């Protein structure tokens, strides 16, 4: 015992010296990578500024954005041993988004996304693997499948709107829309993607697991039992297993010659027609992509639908024009669904949806990791291993006419700012990893705006900071969009 204490005492100076050397080198390497870019002069050892990020994500990123204004549109920081760069300038963001390849950048979706979502996630693929999966996925978002999805979307949306009528339309008490919309979106994505293969109990399990996954994206990445991040990883594993069962059932159904009724059916139907099957078409590989899709459609769509309600309530003239636009084609009394042609003709409502996505893009930024040194500007080269955050939010307020104003007419056929400032509208990303389901997401938002605004009057419960942005993990209003709801019509379908 004495000898052990003596040994430890003799080693203590060396251990302390090694620790001090490590801390010194950590600060030195940070300063070398930082160069002359704005950011903290010194960072907290090992963990960096991750506590500030988790405590108040909005404030953290606002400060990074403000610092970027003092340079060429870049600022830096340090998170759990990772040097990070925040990109505010839209052109520099495009440069990152269009260079996802083995010698430049890899999309991560989250600073610790690969550990959370797993190796088979579409998020982390590039090169031929990514092209192969995209070739399989893209046909599932063309006109015929989208038309089938639209009917499913509307059935679910109307079911939830009727439930809201029964529960809240008296207008006697306010309701926070966030949880209502989240439940609507989760059922919609389950129904559209794998609907026939889920029973009530499995749907509940999926809902719980996605809640854990959402919490995991905002937690300190400690992958141990009892920690939120570790529980989120386990939730992802369960979701992949659940989706794998659905894929297997779909393949059997399509092999029997039945018609596709949901996204996984359209996908497996095309796989069965190929001989031999294409790469990355095993049950687990497809299920990993479905988990990605459902996660994106749930949280991103919850954000966009929430902000749609916020903006429609605060812009009475926009709401009036939406109702007028929709009334030309659809009424909640008609007992009919909106057709694909009618949806395409709701041009003002579609412009409102695009402006919601510009004004409040659900994912404010998309993390990438530099897989090699990359020269971003004439004066700065991004070091290998850096996590880069191109800001889709900041890009949306560059170039556009009066960008701080909510103005759907900017997307009219006359002004066409979506084409004029195409490189600034990055809500769905850019380059090879641009969102493959963007037409589906846009249709979902347009359908919700059309039906919700036609069936309800709604009045916001205003409070200090209610419109402030919070990241949970996508952008949402701080109050969860609390409103009084009341029915516009005596009857509904």
From Swiss-Prot:
Cellular compartments annotated: Membrane
Tissue expression remark: Very weak expression in roots and root hairs. Not detected in the root tips.
A Gene Ontology BP annotation from the UniProt entry: sterol biosynthetic process
EC numbers: 1.14.19.41
Pathway: Steroid biosynthesis; sterol biosynthesis
Any Pfam family: p450
Induction: Not induced by pathogen infection.
Alphabetic keyword roster: Heme, Iron, Lipid biosynthesis, Lipid metabolism, Membrane, Metal-binding, Monooxygenase, NADP, Oxidoreductase, Steroid biosynthesis, Steroid metabolism, Sterol biosynthesis, Sterol metabolism, Transmembrane, Transmembrane helix
GO cellular component: membrane
Record field: transmembrane: 5-25
InterPro entries: Cyt_P450, Cyt_P450_CS, Cyt_P450_E_grp-I, Cyt_P450_sf
Cofactors demanded by this protein: heme
Main localization, broad class: membrane
Membrane topology: Single-pass membrane protein
Main enzyme class: oxidoreductase
Family in the record: Belongs to the cytochrome P450 family.
Protein name per Swiss-Prot or TrEMBL: Cytochrome P450 710A4
